[in-house]
Amino acid sequence: MTHKELHIEAHFSGHETFPLRQMWLKKAFEQAETNSIISKETFSDDGAIATFGVGRNMVSSIKHWALACEVMREDESKKYFVLDEIARKIYADGGYDPYAEYPTTAWYAHWCLAGRGSRSTTWFWLFNVLNAQTFTRDEIMPTLAKFAQSISGGRKLSQATLARDLETCVRGYAPRSTSNSVEEAAEPMLAELGLLQEERKGVYSFRRGPKSSLTDAFFAWALVDFWDRYYLGETSLTFEAVAYGLGSPGRVFKLDEESTAERLFGLSALTDGKLKWSDTAGLRQIYRSDFDAKAFARVMMKRSYE
């Protein structure tokens, strides 16, 4: 059983230093026409400021977050954006969470950023590669820069760009406690997850352990997403892979061993035996039967909101 080599694209900008806000993904979603297409001009024409009710830089930020959180993607023709299937299920009128009120919606956005690392290299690095439990931004900048350089294909990266990206990432989970700006004081979408806290000024620590707002169904959804991303074709995974592997639910959700094990114990009942936990002769593994992963994902995502 081997972990598929990571192929993370180096992407450290686009958000204009604005952390993801609560209703921004919904705002982007609402721009779609009846055929699920969003014109690129929606984010760049003269009416964009009035359409979104924010400044031009924030409009650019909303577009970035909608792409990074996989609300929309660029069409193959690169002429327009098209809504993602999961986004349609979540944000549509009558959908699972049209007003972005459920924690699962924030967990899904976090998974896209820190689990998949799409347009969010620093997010993936912070939750998967960084081993420090407590840190300051200055302390971890050199290791981020080294990681960024290793995946950039020789492209020179600005230290200032990396520093802004890291600050935006951290503030998205642990916002500044004092701010003169109303927008800055608004609660970032991911802060409610309780993954990161500012212990004292400039010193941050991960909150590792059980996550009460993370549903078992969404954990199962994320597990299979991770499985098919890095272990496609394998019929079993070790406990260590699920708890500690790069891009794994254990790392991305900052679960401790006990919390991860508790989630795995209940998978057989939750999934009607499609996923089964085994602890035989000290070998802890999770097994999967032969099932339609896409259909399974749709069922688990729906149950995440029930």
Feature-to-residue mapping (PLM):
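Donor-sugar nucleotide-binding helix/loop cap in glycosyltransferases
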Residues: T2-E306
